[in-house]
Swiss-Prot record:
Compartments where found: Cell outer membrane
Keyword annotations: Cell outer membrane, Lipoprotein, Membrane, Palmitate, Signal
Family of the protein in this entry: Belongs to the BamC family.
Role, per record: Part of the outer membrane protein assembly complex, which is involved in assembly and insertion of beta-barrel proteins into the outer membrane.
Origin superkingdom: Bacteria
Database matches in Gene3D superfamilies: 3.30.530.50, Outer membrane protein assembly factor BamC
Protein name: Outer membrane protein assembly factor BamC
GO BP annotations listed: Gram-negative-bacterium-type cell outer membrane assembly; protein insertion into membrane
Covalent lipid sites (N-palmitoyl cysteine): 20
Lipidation (S-diacylglycerol cysteine): 20
Species classification: Bacteria, Pseudomonadati, Pseudomonadota, Gammaproteobacteria, Vibrionales
GO cellular component terms listed in the entry, alphabetical order: cell outer membrane
Listed NCBIfam families: PRK11679.1
Length: 339
């Protein structure tokens, strides 16, 4: 199940969940029938006089007063997991509530700020708000897994205990088709996890956006020189980490006349077809055209820590000569600077 989109009607937030096909009842209930509910009670065995019974406790049914649904009331859907998208955070689930624990207060504060941002962007109405607590109004969930429209209210708060700092989400109100009801343990756990995941996915999105922004800033200032790899062979050296350079390759190589056909980050290879740019390109970058024939080439990128090595092979897998690599250095530098 995934979050697909959000609708806002007046002051009521409506969150839409999508699921796989089939009816809601089929997704929630076990297949076949529920004839076992009509099973008559067991009667104790009557042993022949003088017989000595042998008891094996392996399959004893535990005795006790157990509470919970039976038959078509039992929800067979797997528990909704809390997405672990916040580095260093540990999710604790207790009594249907979710607490994300962090080791530092600033980390918990960042999660709190993310939650407030998510609430504002999704226009979730609030009933109460303090510096460390918010109580939401009704949030409606339209889910393909449900026969009814689910409504829920939440209490989100910052907590602290034993030098740990947490962000806690508690489901405090439940209704179905507008009628307030007592929430089941299963639904409390499930819809607490849904709301928690709205926060964790937003946190992850913000972190990725910030990483991309930093990478873009770093790539603007990449010194490009000739050098040698660990084996002493001539290569182009980009003075930036491998991961940073890799993110920018889809933009940099096409500007040099290379159409990317295949990429494999784990192997550090990019297969691309080269067609010489027009005269206008060379005039803009202020570099003379390189003597590279049109065709398919493979770029080989090596992780050297805070630097990245770049080599190029032709369609036969043979490295291009050192002179050609030297010609490519000012071109690559000009494209990076232009970016």
């Amino acid at each position: 199940m995934k979050f697909s989109r959000q609708l806002v009607l007046g002051s009521l937030a409506v969150l839409v969940l999508s699921a796989c096909s089939s009816s809601p009842t089929q997704r929630r209930q076990a297949k076949d029938d529920f004839d076992y509910l009509e099973t008559t009670e067991f009667k104790p065995w009557v042993l022949p006089q003088g017989a000595t019974p042998q008891f094996y406790p392996n399959y004893d049914i535990p005795q006790g007063a157990f509470h919970g649904g039976v038959g078509n009331v039992v929800d067979i859907r797997p528990p909704q997991q809390v997405l672990e998208l916040i580095p260093g955070a540990r999710a604790e689930r207790q009594n249907g509530e979710v607490t994300l624990w962090m080791l530092r207060q600033d980390e918990a504060q960042k999660v709190w700020d993310t939650a407030l941002k998510m609430i504002a962007e999704r226009k979730i109405p609030l009933r109460k708000q303090t510096d460390s607590m918010v109580e939401t109004d009704w949030v409606d969930w339209v889910s393909e897994d449900e026969d009814v429209t689910i409504g829920s209210r939440y209490l989100m708060s910052m907590v602290e205990t034993n030098n740990r700092y947490g962000f806690k989400i508690s489901l405090i109100g439940w209704r179905e088709n507008g009628q307030v009801q007592t929430v089941s343990t299963t639904n409390k756990e499930r819809y607490n996890a849904f709301m928690t995941n709205l926060v964790t996915t937003r946190y992850d999105s913000d972190v990725r956006a910030e990483a991309a922004r930093r990478a873009q800033e770093l790539v603007k200032q990449i010194p490009i020189t000739m050098g040698s790899d660990r084996s002493g062979f001539p290569v182009i050296i980009a003075r930036t980490p491998y991961d940073v350079l890799w993110q920018r390759l889809p933009e940099l190589l096409p500007k040099m006349g290379f159409t990317i056909e295949e990429r494999n980050q784990s192997q550090g290879t990019v297969k691309a077809k080269y067609a010489a740019p027009d005269d206008e390109f060379w005039q803009q970058v202020g570099v003379k055209p390189i003597e590279l024939k049109s065709g398919t080439y493979t770029f080989l990128f090596g992780d050297l820590g805070n630097r990245t090595s770049i080599n190029v092979t032709d369609s036969a897998g043979k490295p291009v000569n050192e002179a050609l690599l030297k010609e490519m250095v000012p071109v690559l530098s000009a494209v990076v600077d232009k970016k």
